[in-house]
Amino acid sequence: MGTANEVLKKFKNGEVKYLDMRFTDPKGKLQHLTMDGTAVDDDLLNSGVFFDGSSISGWKAINESDMVLKPDLTTTVMDPFTAQPTLIVFCDVLDAVSKEPYERDPRGTARKAEEYVKASGIGDTIYMGPEAEFFIFDDVKFQVDMNKSMSVSYTHLTLPTIRS
């Protein structure tokens, strides 16, 4: 889907019951606002919906918390895991007053980086992605002593080498 009319037709035909508007907070956590299909109209899809930005850690103070979630209709996909037919759409976060992209929106930051790379001539394509780092331990022990805050000992889990 790519247009508001296409999305609205899915709601009208009963193919979709809910719209799940998703965005990422500054720490990379996926946030969302789910709307009942009866609340979805052309204005919401083209202009967005207001939400309280003070609810997102690191964004806005309560006295200046109005923000807008503006759907990017090129990102719509049916959620395969919900019991009710739900359409997912990723959103841009805008300042409610200026309607400009919010400077702490990770999606907007990624877009600015992409534009900078193209404009500066560094390259014409940029690849970005999260880097999930973690450790797998076979055993972890910790101890707290009277004169020491904490000591930790561990052994790494040895994984077999996978050859192709």
Specify the residue positions occupied by each region the protein language model found:
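Short, Gly/Pro- and small/polar-rich lid/capping loops
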Residues: 1-18
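Flexible, glycine/charged-enriched surface loops at secondary-structure junctions
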Residues: 18, 120-129
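Short, acidic, Ser/Thr-enriched surface-loop or helix-capping motifs
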Residues: 25
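Glycine-rich, N-terminal phosphate-binding loop and its surrounding beta-alpha-beta segment
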Residues: 41-120
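Short, conserved secondary-structure transition motifs
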Residues: 132-143
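Surface-exposed loop and adjacent secondary-structure segments within mature catalytic domains
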Residues: 149-154
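Conserved small/polar residues in nucleotide/adenosyl-binding loops
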Residues: 155-161
